[in-house]
Amino acid sequence: MSVSKKDVEYVAELARLEFKEEEKDNFVNDLNKILNYMEKLDELNTDDVDIVVNPYYIENKYREDNVEKSMELKEVIDNAPENLEEYVIVPKVID
């Protein structure tokens, strides 16, 4: 399989793109290099290779939900740069 200049012109027309003749020639050359590389990959025997990633076999890894001691409210308020009673004042993020 190879890409011709006519193929590049057709796709460019569909995408409403305009290219110089030199650019078209470069595209033909680059696309043919890619296709040749893919053909080489097709020759590779992968019968004995295990599937490395398959989204159908991925499982969620859940952790235990353990309650742990956290900071006391007074300690949080004392460490906050600004506070209003029991609330920490933070800079405005969204206008």
From Swiss-Prot:
Pfam family of the protein (one): GatC
SUPFAM superfamilies: Glu-tRNAGln amidotransferase C subunit (SSF141000)
E.C. number(s) listed in UniProt: 6.3.5.-
Keywords: ATP-binding, Ligase, Nucleotide-binding, Protein biosynthesis
Gene3D superfamilies listed in its UniProt record: Glu-tRNAGln amidotransferase C subunit, N-terminal domain
Superkingdom per UniProt: Bacteria
Keyword Transcription regulation attached: no
Signal sequence annotation: none
Membrane spanning stretches: none
InterPro entries linked: Asp/Glu-ADT_sf_sub_c (IPR036113), GatC (IPR003837)
Catalytic activity from the UniProt record: L-glutamyl-tRNA(Gln) + L-glutamine + ATP + H2O = L-glutaminyl-tRNA(Gln) + L-glutamate + ADP + phosphate + H(+); L-aspartyl-tRNA(Asn) + L-glutamine + ATP + H2O = L-asparaginyl-tRNA(Asn) + L-glutamate + ADP + phosphate + 2 H(+)
Any one GO molecular-function label of the UniProt entry: glutaminyl-tRNA synthase (glutamine-hydrolyzing) activity
Function, as annotated: Allows the formation of correctly charged Asn-tRNA(Asn) or Gln-tRNA(Gln) through the transamidation of misacylated Asp-tRNA(Asn) or Glu-tRNA(Gln) in organisms which lack either or both of asparaginyl-tRNA or glutaminyl-tRNA synthetases. The reaction takes place in the presence of glutamine and ATP through an activated phospho-Asp-tRNA(Asn) or phospho-Glu-tRNA(Gln).
PANTHER family: GLUTAMYL-TRNA(GLN) AMIDOTRANSFERASE SUBUNIT C, MITOCHONDRIAL
Subunit structure: Heterotrimer of A, B and C subunits.
Protein name: Aspartyl/glutamyl-tRNA(Asn/Gln) amidotransferase subunit C
UniProt gene name: gatC
